[in-house]
Amino acid sequence: MARRKSRYSGIGGQAVLEGVMMKNKEKYAVAVRKPDGEIDVEVETYQGLAHGSRIKELPFIRGIFNFLDSLLLGTRALNYSASFYEEEDSKETKFDKAMDKMSGGNGEKLLSGIVTVISVVLAVGLFIVLPYFISSLFESFIRNRSLMAIIEGVIRIALFLLYVWGISAMKDIRRLYQYHGAEHKCINCIEKGRPLTVHNVMHSSRLHKRCGTSFIFFVMLVSIVLFFFIQVDNVAEKVILRILLMPVVAGISYEIIRLAGRTDNIFIKILSAPGMWIQRMTTKEPDESMAEVAIASVEAVFDWKKYLQDTFGYEVDESWMKDEASAEPED
């Protein structure tokens, strides 16, 4: 069967502990394979920061809000999935009660916000500040600022790759990467115009241009270019400027990956290639049970049959689904 060109669906998601979160507009679903083998699906709404404000629609500015929303929602989804694997006899701690009291009963949301802030601080420290200090060790014998900016960027990318490779050795992270692959396979299956069956999902690609991994790579790339123009000598000023520029970096990176998700020309393919390569580290081939969980999450927030009819111009029936089951696997 001839390969179909991908069509943008608007859905996205992320892997969680033993499950997948999928988001479509303001609805999101978290599907988790519980310890007893059953699939639990929770559907909620998330309107996001600056909801209803036109500022969220502005190019570059919207990328900052989308990045923060992704972190907040992702943390919330991870906390929900982890709750199924906590000790059954665990009791509410004093910390939990204090969080609920401070937030007016919304302790979980407050905790998600705190975790998000801590995560951002650690990420900035590890991948923005640390590469600068490591690269500064070369300043005694390299006087060219342009070359120093490139060295700093290379160190930043190397640290990120080392981090991704290092945590992949952990069993739980490897399973998280498998669910990450299942999430991508579901989206690719739909956007290639195939019915959302386990067979079709398993034969779809686990790599996707709109992946957060690719976004992080673009952040690294854009930061190299922007930091290239920081021409100050004071160490504190250099570090502060790098931190202050991160929202700008995130905004530009979002626009690039947004364009990549909606365009399929040779330039975009070349630009997306490094991020797609890194996804080979952050995604692993899932098994069929993981594909089932991902499908359950998609179906809770997205009418894929209507999407196939509206986008590709055909209705899905049982005979057509059987024909699609014989489609060749994607690379």
Where on the chain are the PLM-derived regions?
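Polar-ligand-bearing catalytic/cofactor-coordination segments
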Residues: 2-12, 16, 20-22, 142, ...
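Multi-pass alpha-helical transmembrane bundle typical of ion/small-solute transporters
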Residues: 46-47, 51-54, 64-67, 71-92, ...
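Select subsegments of transmembrane alpha-helices in polytopic membrane proteins
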Residues: 111-127, 208-219
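Cytosolic juxtamembrane amphipathic/interface segments immediately preceding
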Residues: 2-10, 15-16, 51-57, 97-112, ...
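Hydrophobic transmembrane alpha-helix segments characteristic of membrane transport
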Residues: 86-108, 112, 125-148
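Residue-level signature of transmembrane alpha-helical entry/exit and packing/kink sites
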Residues: 108, 112, 116, 148-156, ...
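Juxtamembrane "helix exit" motif at the C-terminal ends of alpha-helical transmembrane segments
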Residues: 80, 84, 119-144, 219-250, ...
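Divalent-cation
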Residues: 1-86
